């Protein structure tokens, strides 16, 4: 019997790489993407591209409008996206309250319905500035919840939360993506929803730095490439 897994596919580099890792592990993937009122909704087009590239046949787009109450620069247009660089001492305003908990809960529901063995997550605790729901402790706690709150869990068959990149640096993620043939240029990481990535938000800065260090400057944002060309 083919083993199945759910992949949370945002359209970003991390989730695309995680999807490729899951496929390499022999899973038939079911992808979940979310329109949650994010200003960078452009990532959903990237998610579709990645799903098509990886030949993922079942791809669900779920509407969960977290912008109704805002609380984050990603879901509230009145809050500016920080562009002054990363401050590791604070939880940034780009943190979306409860987002991963909502997403993983829906993934757990789908996993039970499809009898999937695993839920693959592209979360990363190393290069991000303090998101509380991107930590190994959070994953462990949610696994306990899945074990206790589901029929599959009570039968000893709860879907396992797998986050293969959680302790990888972004440079390591870039290298894994390249080794797996992930089309990095088709992924979207920028917090803005413009035609081109801004090159200034935390996500762009982290990605650009990693691409440069890994030896792929041609994949960096136009802003960085232009500045290096001067």
Curated annotation (Swiss-Prot):
Binding note for cofactor: Binds 1 zinc ion per subunit.
A Pfam family reported for this protein in Swiss-Prot or TrEMBL: QueC
Annotated positions binding ATP: 9-19
Keywords: ATP-binding, Ligase, Metal-binding, Nucleotide-binding, Queuosine biosynthesis, Zinc
Biological processes, Gene Ontology terms: queuosine biosynthetic process
NCBIfam families registered for this protein in UniProt: 7-cyano-7-deazaguanine synthase QueC
Function according to Swiss-Prot or TrEMBL: Catalyzes the ATP-dependent conversion of 7-carboxy-7-deazaguanine (CDG) to 7-cyano-7-deazaguanine (preQ(0)).
Name the UniProt record assigns to this protein: 7-cyano-7-deazaguanine synthase
Organism (species): Microcystis aeruginosa (strain NIES-843 / IAM M-2473)
């Amino acid at each position: 019997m083919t083993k199945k897994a759910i992949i949370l596919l945002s359209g970003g580099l991390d989730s695309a790489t995680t999807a490729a890792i899951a496929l390499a592990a022999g899973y038939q993937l079911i992808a979940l993407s979310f329109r949650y009122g994010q200003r960078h909704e452009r990532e959903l087009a990237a998610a579709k591209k990645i799903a098509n590239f990886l030949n993922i046949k079942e791809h669900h787009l779920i509407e969960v409008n977290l912008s109704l109450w805002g609380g984050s620069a990603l879901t509230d247009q009145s809050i500016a996206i920080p562009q002054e660089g990363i401050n590791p001492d604070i939880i940034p305003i780009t943190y979306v309250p409860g987002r991963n908990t909502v997403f993983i809960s829906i993934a757990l529901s789908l996993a039970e319905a499809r009898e999937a063995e695993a839920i693959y997550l592209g979360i990363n605790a190393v290069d991000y500035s303090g998101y509380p729901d991107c930590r190994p402790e959070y994953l462990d706690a949610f696994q306990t919840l899945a074990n206790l709150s589901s029929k599959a869990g009570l039968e000893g068959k709860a879907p396992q939360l797998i986050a293969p990149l959680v302790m990888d640096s972004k440079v390591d993620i870039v290298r894994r993506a390249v080794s797996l043939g992930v089309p990095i240029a088709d992924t979207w990481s920028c917090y803005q929803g413009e035609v081109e990535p801004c090159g200034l938000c935390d996500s762009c800065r982290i990605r650009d730095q990693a691409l440069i260090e890994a030896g792929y400057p041609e994949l960096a944002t136009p802003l960085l490439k232009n500045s290096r060309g001067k």
